[in-house]
Regions:
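Helix-to-loop junction immediately C-terminal to a conserved catalytic motif
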Residues: 49
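Conserved ABC transporter NBD signature motif
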Residues: 57-65
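Conserved ABC ATPase "signature" region
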Residues: 65, 110-125
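ABC ATPase NBD coupling module
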Residues: 66-83
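Conserved catalytic motifs of ABC-family nucleotide-binding domains
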Residues: 150
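Catalytic Walker B motif of ABC-type/P-loop ATPase nucleotide-binding domains
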Residues: 154-157
């Protein structure tokens, strides 16, 4: 099943970051995007996740073109079907880690998975305010929140950037298990080529073009 389709999208920020980008994301599929710092990887992820509008071309989610969706429909998709993991985490600072997860629990109507908390090693700090947590702990809370939400597509920008190798490997196992069990898809941006090649497909953003290398 096709979850996302990008057709000939381009975007400029002071200069053209990427041009004529096209690809598709299918159910149970993981795609990694690599490239040099400043190549436009994160901007591309923002366009694909509807946070930015492409200058040209189109993005479709679940066979519906974003540009023709009603605001109500797009808002519903963002709330329920898209999971975003970015380097800034976007956690609610006044809340505890558990309260941050409860926001996703309400959206998905699923119980918070205690095993998930254990595997991400955040069970012991779950009642603490997120401002008291380290960067790595905040990142793991952000990952747990997205998986609790149970989105159809995960967009992840350097999701293992603040984690040690053992924890990073466990996070990737969680992602791949989730994609398989829920029929979801994931687009991941990373500078780590070893991590990228764990995904089904790898694209490199270079000289404004997106090239499939795996």
């Amino acid at each position: 099943m096709n979850l996302l389709s990008a057709k000939n999208i381009s975007h400029t920020f002071e200069y053209e970051l990427f041009s004529d980008v096209s690809f598709e994301l299918n159910a149970q599929e993981s795609i990694a995007i690599i490239g040099m710092s400043g190549s436009g990887k994160s901007t591309l992820l923002h366009v694909l996740s509807t946070l930015l509008t492409p200058d040209s071309g189109s993005v479709s989610l679940f066979d519906e073109e974003i540009q023709t969706m009603s605001k109500k429909r797009l808002s519903s998709i963002k709330r329920h079907d898209l999971g975003l993991i970015f380097q800034s985490h976007y956690l609610f600072n006044g809340f505890s880690a558990y309260e941050n997860l409860e926001v996703s629990e309400i959206l998905s109507r699923e119980k918070i998975d205690e095993e998930l908390l254990t595997r991400l090693d955040i069970k012991k700090v779950i009642e603490q305010k997120v401002t008291q947590l380290s960067g790595g702990q905040q990142q793991r809370v952000s990952i747990a929140r997205v998986l609790t939400k149970q989105p159809r597509i995960i967009f992840a920008d350097e999701p293992t950037g603040n984690l040690d190798k053992t924890t990073a490997d466990e996070v990737m196992k969680l992602f791949f298990e989730y994609l398989k069990n829920k029929g979801a898809g994931m687009i991941l941006v990373t500078h780590d080529e070893t991590l990228a090649h764990k995904c089904d497909k790898v694209y490199k953003l270079e000289n404004r073009q997106l090239l499939e290398i795996k």
